[in-house]
Amino acid sequence: MSRSGTDPQQRQQASEADAAAATFRANDHQHIRYNPLQDEWVLVSAHRMKRPWQGQVEPQLLKTVPRHDPLNPLCPGAIRANGEVNPQYDSTFLFDNDFPALQPDAPSPGPSDHPLFQAKSARGVCKVMCFHPWSDVTLPLMSVPEIRAVVDAWASVTEELGAQYPWVQIFENKGAMMGCSNPHPHCQVWASSFLPDIAQREERSQQAYKSQHGEPLLMEYSRQELLRKERLVLTSEHWLVLVPFWATWPYQTLLLPRRHVRRLPELTPAERDDLASIMKKLLTKYDNLFETSFPYSMGWHGAPTGSEAGANWNHWQLHAHYYPPLLRSATVRKFMVGYEMLAQAQRDLTPEQAAERLRALPEVHYHLGQKDRETATIA
């Protein structure tokens, strides 16, 4: 054995590893990154952005959306599929989904007769929340006070449904590309009698990290990202927006409170005001990236609720995920197919490159005229 305690082969391997590390550049060389929140890996292949695109191009959405359409079931005064007439609402409007995926009184399946064929009870409620009475606006085109009303409605419905159900999932699918069948600004709320798969993974990961390191995973992650800065998109007094180190979608972002907060209802008035403001800035940047109404799916994750709401959930940190599909332009999207479906997620653009592009974008919406832009910038 050598004096260093390693044989020549080990020294050669160590030397080769050092040489590889010295030449590695994340923006040029493929590598895999770990997602500690959801316990999975993503393949990053930034060099693929140099290839010419010959795949599918989505059609440009040039259709003008009317401000009010009496035939649109989400508009004030419209008749919905169940025959009910919407009120003449002027802010947010919450109602039961006419075609729910979960119902509160569904019968339970019987016991399984084989471990490979298991089924369990699934009960819950599904609601729809309209953000605004007008169909021709989206969140980035709404005022900060109007978005604040949405935040308050999110907190209220979480508290209401969370009194009975262990998981309340708020999510928004924006744009036809993400399967949204109605252009009216709205989201959905599904409350379930069970923890969905992703919630279970985040529960296990956050609990394990807190047990091992003594603090919440996402609190430490936020501190590290604030120090490193390269993936930050927006920061404010109470919130930060970043492209996660492990992002799978091209311009995916994570929205986090700076303070330790477990659920939406725990947000203070100041935090809610600030959340409305930073959401407007983020979504404006999204729209400005390709000068289009940027499609995405987003949703909130917080500590479980229901009968166990009073348990110790201090390992949880409230957060929102934004998953937009666009990659190269308003008409070229990322597809999660093939390798992603059969092996693991893969991305071309690095998270650092995505964050840099989003940071550089203006916080005034491209739809505004020059005079409006100057006024908004001064304000």
From Swiss-Prot:
Residues 1-21 are annotated as: Disordered. Its cofactor is Zn(2+). It catalyses: alpha-D-galactose 1-phosphate + UDP-alpha-D-glucose = alpha-D-glucose 1-phosphate + UDP-alpha-D-galactose. Pathway: Carbohydrate metabolism; galactose metabolism. Keywords: Carbohydrate metabolism, Cataract, Disease variant, Galactose metabolism, Metal-binding, Nucleotidyltransferase, Transferase, Zinc. Residues 9-21 have a biased composition (Low complexity). One of its GO terms (molecular function) is zinc ion binding. SUPFAM superfamilies: HIT-like. Belongs to the galactose-1-phosphate uridylyltransferase type 1 family. This is Galactose-1-phosphate uridylyltransferase. It comes from Homo sapiens (Human). The lineage of its organism: Eukaryota, Metazoa, Chordata, Craniata, Vertebrata. The gene is GALT.
